[in-house]
């Protein structure tokens, strides 16, 4: 079980809604993933009350919606988007994203912290997308964020846990859930994050652009389950030198045989 704010999740796979070929395919993949928390960009939602091709299927699916502020370049823009989401969708949960750099989509740490402090004071459950910076993650935690979401690699890059060393520190120090977000491109990456001690991962591109998104969603679901089981079982410590599982020295000395 994973507890974030007032909600308990049985799935540790969080998913996104972008890049799917069709809304139907998106819905099928999300169902196959078993995800209970789905993020969506407010800029892609029809707030005029029409038949929204993204929002309506998600509401039918019964998952918790996590509107994000993707597209915001400043704290002020992100706060405005979060307030709009709360008014339109009736949720006080928000994934805080502020990335003014359009090439690498790296989060702005200063604006992110500034927006987080404002939104927490307004009663939002804030899950900030941020760089894998242990100091920043601790500051976001102290500001009242319900979780932190450090990147594994740039958004959509599918490059895996390029920030592994820093993720280890973040996980070690965190007193709130750590959700590895961005860069996870294969089920093995998600498994690695769980073995590191992450509480969950968020995956979008790797599922949406797969040749078979539904099967890929199932693969990620199984990887997360395997990673959690492995962590609960207790992974063996790594060794620099070889350690034989069945020492043969005594056995050979007792035989007394020579060639």
UniProtKB/Swiss-Prot annotation:
One of its GO terms (cellular component) is cytoplasm. InterPro entries: Aldolase_TIM, Thiazole_synthase_ThiG, ThiG. This is Thiazole synthase. One of its GO terms (molecular function) is thiazole synthase activity. The keyword Aminoacyl-tRNA synthetase does not apply. It catalyses: [ThiS sulfur-carrier protein]-C-terminal-Gly-aminoethanethioate + 2-iminoacetate + 1-deoxy-D-xylulose 5-phosphate = [ThiS sulfur-carrier protein]-C-terminal Gly-Gly + 2-[(2R,5Z)-2-carboxy-4-methylthiazol-5(2H)-ylidene]ethyl phosphate + 2 H2O + H(+). It is an enzyme of class 2 (transferase). Catalyzes the rearrangement of 1-deoxy-D-xylulose 5-phosphate (DXP) to produce the thiazole phosphate moiety of thiamine. Sulfur is provided by the thiocarboxylate moiety of the carrier protein ThiS. In vitro, sulfur can be provided by H(2)S. GO terms for biological process: thiamine diphosphate biosynthetic process. It comes from Serratia proteamaculans (strain 568).
């Amino acid at each position: 079980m994973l507890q974030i704010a007032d909600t308990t999740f049985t799935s540790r796979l969080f998913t996104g809604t972008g890049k799917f070929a069709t809304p139907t395919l998106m819905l099928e993949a999300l169902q196959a993933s078993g995800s209970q928390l789905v993020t969506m960009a407010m800029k892609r939602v029809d707030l005029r009350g029409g038949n929204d091709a993204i929002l309506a299927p998600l509401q039918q699916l019964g998952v918790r919606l996590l509107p994000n502020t993707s597209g915001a370049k400043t704290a002020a823009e992100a706060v405005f988007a979060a307030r709009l989401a709360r008014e339109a969708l009736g949720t006080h949960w928000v994934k805080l994203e502020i990335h003014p750099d359009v090439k690498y989509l790296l989060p702005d740490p200063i604006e992110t912290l500034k927006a987080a402090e404002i939104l927490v004071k307004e009663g939002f459950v804030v899950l900030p997308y941020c760089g894998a910076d242990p100091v920043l993650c601790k500051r976001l935690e102290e500001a009242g964020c319900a979780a932190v979401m450090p990147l594994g690699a740039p958004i959509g890059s599918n490059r895996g846990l390029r920030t592994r060393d820093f993720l280890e520190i973040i996980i070690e120090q965190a007193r709130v859930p750590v959700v590895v977000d961005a860069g996870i491109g294969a089920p093995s990456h998600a498994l690695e994050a769980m073995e590191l001690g992450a509480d969950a991962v968020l995956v979008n591109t790797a599922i949406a652009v797969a040749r078979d998104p539904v099967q890929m969603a199932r693969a990620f679901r199984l990887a997360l389950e395997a990673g959690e089981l492995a962590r609960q079982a207790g992974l063996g410590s790594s060794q620099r030198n070889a350690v034989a599982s069945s020492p043969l020295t005594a056995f050979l000395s007792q035989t007394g045989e020579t060639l």
